[in-house]
From Swiss-Prot:
Keyword flag Methyltransferase: yes
Residues annotated to bind dUMP: R22, R180, S181, C182, D183, N191, H221, I222, Y223
One GO biological process term: methylation
Binding site for (6R)-5,10-methylene-5,6,7,8-tetrahydrofolate: D183, S282
InterPro entries the record matches: Thymidate_synth/dCMP_Mease, Thymidate_synth/dCMP_Mease_dom, Thymidate_synth/dCMP_Mease_sf, Thymidylate_synthase, Thymidylate_synthase_AS
Protein name in UniProt: Thymidylate synthase
Keywords of this entry: Cytoplasm, Methyltransferase, Nucleotide biosynthesis, Transferase
Subcellular location: Cytoplasm
Listed EC numbers: 2.1.1.45
One GO MF term attached to the UniProt entry: thymidylate synthase activity
Organism of provenance: Pseudoalteromonas translucida (strain TAC 125)
SUPFAM superfamilies for the chain: Thymidylate synthase/dCMP hydroxymethylase (SSF55831)
One GO term describing the cellular component: cytosol
């Protein structure tokens, strides 16, 4: 929690204004932020200086791991975060590749589970990584990338957190996640929860201990219409201790994740927080 607040304060103190053409809203921006999450000691990185939610973030991650390409699929598992980008993004609405209401196109999990090869076949990056890790293999390329510039026009949004690299040292598994852009007041709570859960979950289904998850953000920003709430409200609050996460121990395979796991198989305990803050979202 402390590192989150330090990043927010850094943006307020040192950030430079950048015009964002996609949203039409200016951002106060810094370059390069490095965060880390102690998964081994179960220090769950959920924001405590405002009321935050974790189940939608986990549901979104499950949708990515399943390769979902429709906002309707995400809604069915308890996540509404793709409704706006699928149905209110003017550039995507006018894109001839859009297949209709709720279509997201070839974004995030589609790339992770069905990366197009030149011969027309697809590569399941996630399955490759899981199979290697289950067999104790780290080829220094246990990487899942959602970032496919050749297909950006086929999706509603370029991936923000785009690359996840797993590293195995002995029986301890580590994760390094790279993010090109982060809406810190709104998006980072989701992102850091997903980094933590991704490592914890993959460690569980591959039979390893979880170590640390490292999270590198290139462009960290606060939108102009969020600044006052961040500076004058959230940063004035004292954080509470980190909560802990419980994962259903019956989740033992990628097939389990694909077939029956829900957001209710994850439970946060010991969460204390301040009152909610309603930050505006820029589409």
């Amino acid at each position: 929690m402390k590192q989150y607040l330090q990043l927010c304060q850094r943006i307020v103190d040192e950030g430079q204004w950048v015009e964002n053409k996609r949203t039409g809203t200016r951002c106060l921006t810094v370059i390069n932020a490095d965060l880390e999450y102690d998964v081994a000691n179960n220090q769950f990185p959920m924001i405590t200086t405002r009321k935050s939610y974790y189940k939608a973030a986990i549901a979104e991650l499950l949708g990515y791991l399943r390769g979902y390409d429709s906002a309707a699929q995400f809604r069915e598992i308890g996540c509404k975060t793709w409704d706006a980008n699928a149905n209110e993004n003017s550039a995507w609405l006018n894109n001839p590749h859009r297949k209709g209401e709720d279509d997201m196109g070839r974004v995030y999990g589609v790339q992770g589970r069905a990366w197009q090869r030149p011969d027309g076949s697809t590569l399941d990056q996630l399955a490759k990584v899981i199979n290697n890790l289950k067999n104790g293999i780290d080829d220094r390329g246990e990487i899942i990338s959602f970032y496919n510039p050749g297909e950006f026009e086929l999706g509603c949004l370029r991936p923000c957190m785009h690359t996840h690299t797993f590293s195995l040292l002995g029986d301890t598994l580590y994760l390094t996640s790279i993010q090109r852009s982060c809406d810190v007041p709104l998006g980072l709570n989701f992102n850091q929860i997903q980094c933590f859960v991704l490592l914890a979950l993959v460690a569980q289904i591959t039979g390893h201990k979880a170590g640390k998850a490292y999270h590198k953000i290139t462009n960290a920003h606060i939108y102009e219409n969020q600044l006052e709430l961040m500076r004058d409200v959230q940063l004035k609050r004292e954080p509470f201790a980190s909560p802990q996460l419980k994962i259903n121990p019956n989740i033992k395979s990628l097939n389990d994740i694909e077939t029956w796991v829900t957001r209710d198989d994850f439970e946060v305990t010991g969460y204390e927080c301040h009152e909610a803050i309603q930050y505006p979202f820029s589409v």
